[in-house]
Amino acid sequence: MIHKSHKIIGLLVLITSCTDAKVEDVATTESTAVSSMENYKNKTLQIYTTARDTELRLTKTSAHTFSDKVQPLETEIAVFVNPEKTFQEYLGIGGAITDASSEVFSTLNDTQQNKLLQSLYGKDGIGYNIIRTSIHSSDFGLGSHTYIEEGDADLKTFSIEKDKEKRLPFIKRAIDLIGDDLVFYASPWSPPAFMKSNNNMLQGGKLLPEFRQAWANYYVKFIKAYEEEGIPVWGLTIQNEPMAVQRWESCIYTAEEERDFLKNYLGPTLEKEGLGDKNIVVWDHNRDLITDRANTIFEDPEASKYAWGIGFHWYETWTGGLPKYDNLKNIYESFPSKNLLFTEGCQEGFATEKLQFWPNAERYGNSMINDFNSGVVGWTDWNILLDERGGPNHVENFCFAPIHANTKTGELIYTPTYYYIGHFSKFIKPGAVRVSTTTSRTTIESTSFKNKDGKIVTVVMNTTDTKIAYKLIVGNSETDLEIEPRAMQSIIY
């Protein structure tokens, strides 16, 4: 019995020792984990603000300092940033230089042209680095055109002379200001009429099977012609809005048709022509059907190998409901090797009295915050510049742009949208990574990126009519801030 008792006591000592060791290990691990988070105490934050009913427009409004974090209460509003949790790398932000933008730009005098360029692309502007353009015409221009004579399937008459008149000079001046961070891509709205089932560049129709190779060759001609002009083409989308029959240039592809055109024609043709490094973006339509397109193309290895990622627009709400940001998150999680790129968005239905209409800007802010938080790497606005009517547009589809020019007076009109976009594009730099950011209330929205220099940019939007006091909690540090009613902030630290 005595020997048995000794064994029991010895076993208890061993168990106690092991338990103590595990508790000590856990405590050590937790301590190490906490200490690994960067402490922002005493670091200074710079805040830039744009707010309705004020003169604040990307204005440096205040500087604050971090202190030690205190447990937030349920009654307090807070933004939580965890710089240790990183996500997608940021490609950039920009907009489209269309024929319409180029027409309007050409009416401005030298001073106003330079002002516009600096506003968008200059060091003191909002830092655009992405440019989208159309492969021949879209609705935003004076009319429809292609780069060949009608019926020329061999593309012997291919020429970009029309683009050299106004579009290319505008693009080149923008590129000179952007420099090495340039991302330039192009999208077709429609093949030439003779290549289509409806023999019309407008009103939808489909690419005829017998012209698939000729159409793939057309992309090659475009890329080579632009690069001969000194414009490095980063990539292209296969078709603008491939499920929309529009009264302007449009062409329909089902998911299977786009997949097969990519894997059997466009992808192999680009590779054969030494252009395999160009980034091909599929879909280029709304968030509603994006998952079907991604599943169909990315689950096919022979098609997927040619696709850099998937592009999308924001117009799915035309049928009712709210933006489908959850679809983007699904793709981000389902296909982590593919990229999400916002390729177009604008406020439709131009009206002069709404040039300073604040909800237009808030639509941009809401989309950009939620798109980035869903895994999007880059964001491309539609026309960077339009005239006093929201055009020119050859089918009268007049819309808003961040900047409008009065072609009669030469005045440049900066809308709230310009400033809201700038809260992202001016401070977040290509190569930044998104970091974990959440809010404790729906009254404010937020996202954050960490630039390569280590600086974090947190963007906060308030769409209510009330000033909001909130805590910005970053790791183990916090600071007390306020945001004006109907306002956007960029916080740099």
Task: For each feature predicted by the language model, list its residue ranges.
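Sec-dependent signal peptide recognition
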Residues: 3-11
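C-terminal motif of bacterial Sec signal peptides marking the signal peptidase cleavage site
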Residues: 16-17
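Short, low-complexity, disordered segments immediately C-terminal to signal peptides
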Residues: 22-37
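Short alpha-helical "patches" and their helix-cap loops
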Residues: 29, 109-119, 432-444
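Substrate-binding and catalytic surfaces of secreted/luminal carbohydrate-active proteins
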Residues: 34-60, 70-77, 184-186, 217-224, ...
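N-terminal catalytic cores of secreted or lumenal carbohydrate-active enzymes
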Residues: 59-233, 254, 264
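Residues that line or immediately flank small-molecule/substrate-binding pockets and catalytic motifs
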Residues: 97, 135, 240, 313-314, ...
